[in-house]
A protein has these predicted regions:
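Mg2+-dependent phosphoryl-transfer enzymes with acidic/Ser/Thr/Gly-rich catalytic loops
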Residues: 1-5, 23, 194-276
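Active-site phosphate-binding/coordination module
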Residues: 21, 26-126
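Hydrophobic packing residues within well-ordered alpha-helices of enzyme cores
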Residues: 51-55, 169, 250, 266
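Asp-based phosphoryl-transfer active-site loop
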Residues: 4-19
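Short hydrophobic/aromatic-enriched beta-strand-loop microsegments
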Residues: 60-67, 179-180, 240-244, 258-259
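Short, structured coil segments at secondary-structure junctions
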Residues: 58-59, 67, 173-176, 236-237, ...
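Conserved acidic, metal-coordinating active-site core of Asp-based
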Residues: 109-224, 228
Length: 276
């Protein structure tokens, strides 16, 4: 039997929405898959540093980060596709002028403007009641924009208070950037939030690159996701699996819909396809 390649979105897929924990059944499923010779990758909108938040639990060797703009394996960065510094400044200045929140994401750290920093600070006590605000920001490698000193950036996240303001922003996004609406931490914002990467950078692109690197066929790839930034990877892999808690669009595009992320969705899907 050919080796299988497993790609997992994080927030809303591997990490149950609302609980911010990885289920024991998911940890067990990953262990069994590894024992069977499967190659597992996180495939996330998070930066590399933030993607490692749960690495002690899951020990996955591969990480596709920043929605496909970077690939790492066994602790080594294999490639990144950076947004030019001039474009980063132009976009963040525009978001600020329109009253929006943003965070710019590099390999190791995330830098946020004050509005975005407050938005996360307000949600952390609910999501992580046992940790202080400082501990959570450190855990997620998040810093204020004042601490940014020109590091390479792979992704820009943005959000606005209204769709009208967002539309003004969309009209001024250059063709050199790829845009994905409402994924990951922004999945509940509709058209008011999204993510920007270098043109052509998507999770689907990165899945294809990983398969090329390993000399593998897309038929042997299984991709798990729950929101719009997962759409491209579900389309390029042999089997696209949507979580039961996923958006209607992602479920319609999937080959299979499993249980919710917090109801053993990953474990049950891997069982269904006889991977474990």
């Amino acid at each position: 039997m050919s080796e299988k390649y497993l790609f997992f979105d994080m927030d809303g897929t591997m990490i149950a929405p609302g609980t911010h924990h990885i289920l024991p059944s998911t940890v067990e499923a990953l262990k069994q898959a590894e024992e069977k010779g499967c190659h597992a990758f996180l495939c996330t909108g998070r930066g590399y540093g933030m993607a490692l938040e749960y690495q002690d639990e899951i020990k996955i060797p591969g990480v596709v980060f920043s929605n496909g703009a970077g690939i790492a394996y066994e602790g080594k960065i294999l490639e990144t596709h950076d947004i030019g510094q001039e474009t980063v400044k132009k976009m963040t200045d525009l978001i600020t002028a329109l009253g929006g929140g943003f965070q710019i994401i590099g390999v190791d750290y995330i830098w946020q403007n004050a509005k975005e920093h407050r938005r996360f600070a307000e949600r952390f006590p609910i999501e992580y009641p046992d940790l202080s605000e400082e501990e959570v920001f450190a855990r997620k490698a998040m810093h204020l924009i004042d601490e940014y000193h020109g590091e390479a950036i792979q992704k820009i996240d943005f959000n606005f208070d209204s769709e009208l303001t967002a539309d003004l922003f969309f009209a001024r996004i250059p063709a050199s950037l790829e845009i994905v609406l409402s994924g990951g931490y922004y999945a509940n914002l509709g058209r008011r939030g999204g993510e920007l990467m270098k043109e052509g950078m998507t999770k689907g692109y990165a899945v294809k690159r990983v398969l090329e690197m390993f000399g593998a066929d897309s038929h042997d790839a299984y991709c798990f996701g729950d929101s719009m930034n997962d759409m491209t990877m579900l389309q390029v892999c042999g089997t696209g699996i949507a979580m039961g808690n996923g958006t209607e669009d992602i479920k319609k595009s999937a080959d299979y819909v499993t249980n919710d992320a917090d109801h053993d969705g990953i474990y049950n899907a891997l069982k269904h396809f006889n991977i474990i």
